[in-house]
Amino acid sequence: MLKRDMNIADYDAELFAAIQEETLRQEEHIELIASENYTSPRVMEAQGSQLTNKYAEGYPGKRYYGGCEYVDKAEQLAIDRACKLFGCEYANVQPHSGSQANSAVYMALLNPGDTVLGMSLAHGGHLTHGSPVNFSGKHYNVIPYGIDEAGQINYDEMEQLALEHKPKMIIGGFSAYSQIVDWKRMREIADKVDAYLFVDMAHVAGLIAAGEYPTPVPHAHVVTTTTHKTLAGPRGGLILSNAGEDMYKKLNSAVFPGGQGGPLMHVIAGKAVAFKEAMEPEFKAYQARVVKNAKAMVGQFQERGYKIVSNGTENHLFLVDLIDKDITGKDADAALGAANITVNKNSVPNDPRSPFVTSGIRVGTPAITRRGFTEEDAKDLANWMCDVLDNIGNEEVIEATKQKVLEICKRLPVYA
């Protein structure tokens, strides 16, 4: 018999200490990594539920094991809510991650060696969009497209590459692009060469759900996303489509049994909660503030003489190009981290430095907005960051900035 008062603190002091330390770090550090966010206690309650005990290979109503009648209800709720939230006929909520969702799309629609057109990682794409170190770059013939000198996706170049190479699939989406993507134009290009349009909207799914960023769903054959990031749910993946039953069968088979076995029912329950939360008015207001805060920070960085890739942002993130400042992304990351400001070093277009050093940092506002930062707070934060970057290695500036960070974190806790 398992007693409900069993806990980690009394049993595993080392692990409990690590959890407590991470909890404190999240409260006392400003989180600016664009792919990170804080999920709600309701989502965490679902993830800590007894649904974790149930094996449920297959899909609702078509399981390989018995006793799935209640987890079927939970998964169907997640499916129905995802379809309603994003306006689609089909949703698969089982992928354990965004990368596994993307892998399933490749498996469903392509054969090894097929040609794919994807955004270059160096220009803002993602590992799973054809990077040579990833399965997508190893198993498929990848033709990269990028951005022009103004920092915008070059659709004319994309069309020329498509006409020349005749890809079977064109991939839209990004991990470090701050502008609006023209999904309609991408579909037109795909149709000219009879290619699938596959969009990975992981970074902007929350903005799309709230109407703050154009949706790719009416244009793409298949759309994937993570369920964390701007969507603020549990860590996991999601596949969406409106392309018909044949497509849905291929996608389902590619997830199970093609790439995964048993789904994580406790995480799927967390997704169901997050999708319901994303339909609330306060979620829409939150996403609007995410964009406003990003724009406020960009304006302040520019006022202080820092170059922003694409000269601004239309979503939740932006890249600060530090080449002219002769600061590496690695050094900027470390200095800001010492002031309790968490960012990630990031390559910028035509970066002369390696991906392990880089010449830029990526900044995102979902997490700070989640804890209540206003536009004025965002401007103050950008100024503090500029103070640190203007004085790289100055311990007094770093310490003074850290104290400001601790004060605002105390005023705006993540979990009150």
Swiss-Prot record:
Q: Which Pfam families match?
A: SHMT
**Does this entry carry the keyword Lyase?**
no
What coarse category fits the chief subcellular location reported for this protein?
A: cytoplasm
Q: Which Gene3D superfamilies match?
A: Aspartate Aminotransferase, domain 1, Type I PLP-dependent aspartate aminotransferase-like (Major domain)
This protein's GO cellular component annotations are:
cytosol
Cofactor(s) recorded for this entry are: pyridoxal 5'-phosphate
Residues holding (6S)-5,6,7,8-tetrahydrofolate: 121, 125-127, 245, 354-356
* InterPro entries hit by this protein: PyrdxlP-dep_Trfase, PyrdxlP-dep_Trfase_major, PyrdxlP-dep_Trfase_small, Ser_HO-MeTrfase, Ser_HO-MeTrfase-like, Ser_HO-MeTrfase_PLP_BS, SHMT-like_dom
Point out the annotated site residues (description: Plays an important role in substrate specificity).
Answer: 228
Keywords on this record? Amino-acid biosynthesis, Cytoplasm, One-carbon metabolism, Pyridoxal phosphate, Transferase
Catalytic reaction equation(s): (6R)-5,10-methylene-5,6,7,8-tetrahydrofolate + glycine + H2O = (6S)-5,6,7,8-tetrahydrofolate + L-serine
Q: Which residues carry this modification: N6-(pyridoxal phosphate)lysine?
A: 229
The EC number(s) this enzyme carries:
2.1.2.1
Keyword Amino-acid biosynthesis part of the UniProt annotation: yes
Gene Ontology MF, one: pyridoxal phosphate binding
The pathway it acts in is: One-carbon metabolism; tetrahydrofolate interconversion; Amino-acid biosynthesis; glycine biosynthesis; glycine from L-serine: step 1/1
Its GO biological process annotations read: glycine biosynthetic process from serine; tetrahydrofolate interconversion
Subcellular location, record wording: Cytoplasm
Q: Which family does it belong to?
A: Belongs to the SHMT family.
Assembly and interaction partners? Homodimer.
Function per UniProt: Catalyzes the reversible interconversion of serine and glycine with tetrahydrofolate (THF) serving as the one-carbon carrier. This reaction serves as the major source of one-carbon groups required for the biosynthesis of purines, thymidylate, methionine, and other important biomolecules. Also exhibits THF-independent aldolase activity toward beta-hydroxyamino acids, producing glycine and aldehydes, via a retro-aldol mechanism.
Q: What is this protein called?
A: Serine hydroxymethyltransferase 1
Name of the coding gene? glyA1
